[in-house]
Amino acid sequence: MSMVCEFELNGKQEIFEFGKVAKQANGSVLAKIGNAVVLATVVSEFDNPVSEDFTPLTVQYVEKTYAAAKLPGGFIKREGKLSDFETLTSRVIDRSLRPLFPKGYVYPTTITVIVLSADKNVDLQALSLNAANAALYTSNLPIKKSVCGVRVGRVEDGYIINPTPEEMSNSTLDLYVAGSKDELLMIEMKTISSSQMVEVDIEAFTKIHNANEMNEDTLVEAIEFAQNALKEANLTYEKAFETASKEKFQVELVEFGIEESIINYIRDNFSNEIKEAIKKLAKSERATQLKDIAKVISKNDHCTMNEIEFSKIYEAVSIVKREIVRDMIVNEKIRADGRGLKDVRPISIETNILPSAHSSCLFTRGETQALVVGTIAGPKDGQMYEVLTDKSTSMERFMV
């Protein structure tokens, strides 16, 4: 049975329809604002926990070109790999929702957001995060908070929540903030691209150009403005979604950690060996030496009698290593491999090492190396790409 929640927020009518599609998912919702429609689903494998100390969360944000009544550009008329915007939006959703999972939640979880219909006046990034939050909050996963995202623009010294493209064209700020009703979880800000700058008059260009240099008070004011909007939105969501929420599944939260007795044993008996490995060896040699020290410890009577796993011993060695490195920096003013706090490894640069490339160089500093190759081509060789809410095709001329 589906359930519909409808309300007005920030001057726009929002509709969330739960349980209409993707009924086998732990949580699903069709979210609609204007002509924009996104499907968000949450699936978690409660019977397949991982053994590592992290939350196995995967987020996928996918745009379908049919959402804008278009066919994919190029020779292949099917969606290909994710665009930069899809990848970045997936990360935005991940960074915003990952903190909601309780510590010790080790069950593989996938959040998928698919854009089914697009509206150029609706911010798909904000809508997608809010839809993913709705699916997660009303699912049977142990999530107790609502999170949403808002974009803040600044036009004529006034702030706007989720501005339209027309308003953004005159904005001196593009700030995206995500959070719950009582805390901020993610902040992202970007400047207006140079291609957008040249299309406006000189007065607007000056304002936009000056956005690259924003004083701290203005930014704090914008964040506070966003925080107030987030509080209002999350209170609205939590109240509206209450009747649509499923009963929470009682999952076992796994406690990871090393017994203090093991750490104390290594700290008391092997600190000198670990410190010598840190001070005298290069990075790769240091890792090998620390693993050898852990093997010696694992054969010690203290570890064999208590049947302590090697992975736990090696993790305890790493904890003691971090303590020693910090003590060396704070008290002895030296870093790993014996360098002082102001010592910098020499850098070597070799140029034109690839005969057929237009330009190439090899940077080497310590064990870190970077091979950089440049290729110059004509204007027709740029990468064509399309934005879902824009009918025109754009050209990327600088690619890294």
Residue spans for each PLM region:
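Glycine-rich, flexible beta-strand/loop modules in the N-terminal catalytic cores of phosphate-handling
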Residues: 25-109, 115-122, 208, 219, ...
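Small-residue-enriched alpha-helical segments and adjacent helix-cap loops
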Residues: 72, 76-78, 88, 92, ...
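Extended amphipathic alpha-helical scaffolds
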Residues: 1-45, 249-394
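Ordered, soluble secondary-structure elements with a strong preference for glycine-centered loop motifs
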Residues: 15, 79-88, 121-126, 199, ...
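Short glycine/serine/threonine-rich phosphate/pyrophosphate-binding segments
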Residues: 24, 123-129, 146, 171, ...
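Gly/Lys-enriched N-terminal cap/neck module of very large, oligomeric protein machines
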Residues: 19, 25, 29, 110, ...
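Alpha/propeptide regions of enzymes that mature by internal proteolysis
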Residues: 2-5, 9-12, 26, 54-55, ...
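Mobile "lid/hinge" segments at catalytic clefts and subdomain interfaces of large enzymes
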Residues: 142-281
